Amino acid sequence: MSQFFSAGVAAEFFPRWQALVGAAREILERRSPAMVDPAETFITGEGKEICMLVIPHHWLGGVSLVIVARPECIDLRWAVVTDLRDHDQIDLGKVVDGWPSLDAAVQALDPVVVQELSRFIQWSCVYRGEAARPRRIRASLDLNGQLSRLDVVSEFSLWPWPRREVVERTSLSSTNPPAFRLPVPIGRLLKQA
């Protein structure tokens, strides 16, 4: 039994999407991306019709590659997933590809997911002075020549404190974790899935 997508809602709850779940599991098992912990990948959804496969980066605080399957279409997107009380964070994600049907998605999924596993993520942490904890954390992705920003943590301040910014590059397939690590809030996410 695969360790990928074994958490959250059971795959059997989504009989319509079994082929998609199987294809995604096979890709992750074959590629085994270093920054993806199989125990942190999970399935959630809205009823039996909408299935969401969430693949978080182990150290980016919820930055995730998400496959969203709806009856009318299937898409692949990047989102910051830290709260599943509703699926707004997933809905507001940055779509990178989409397909009109299950068959089209299963056939095209492999090269697209493999490309996304290697997509560089710019991980930016802004600190106030010499503080150890960042006040702002964001992930940025180059999607079709446009820099798309995903805010992970943002503490607003009216004071113009001296600041320093630390920028790193990582991906789901990177072998080395970023220097500043923000664990996925997996306990809370699985309770809400």
Residue ranges and their predicted role:
Residues 1-51:
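N-terminal domain-onset segments
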Residues 1-11, 111-193:
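Acidic, proline/glycine-rich low-complexity IDRs
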Residues 81-123:
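Long, charged/polar, surface-exposed segments that mediate recognition or autoinhibition
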Residues 13, 55, 74, 95, ...:
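Acidic, low-complexity intrinsically disordered regions
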Residues 55-58, 79-85, 140-142, 153-155:
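Secondary-structure transition/turn motif
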Residues 58-66, 82-91, 145-149:
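Short, surface-exposed beta-strand/loop "edge" segments at domain boundaries and coil↔beta transitions
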Residues 73-78, 101, 157-165:
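Short, surface-exposed linear segments at secondary-structure transitions and domain or protein termini
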Residues 30-79:
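Amphipathic, interaction-prone secondary-structure segments
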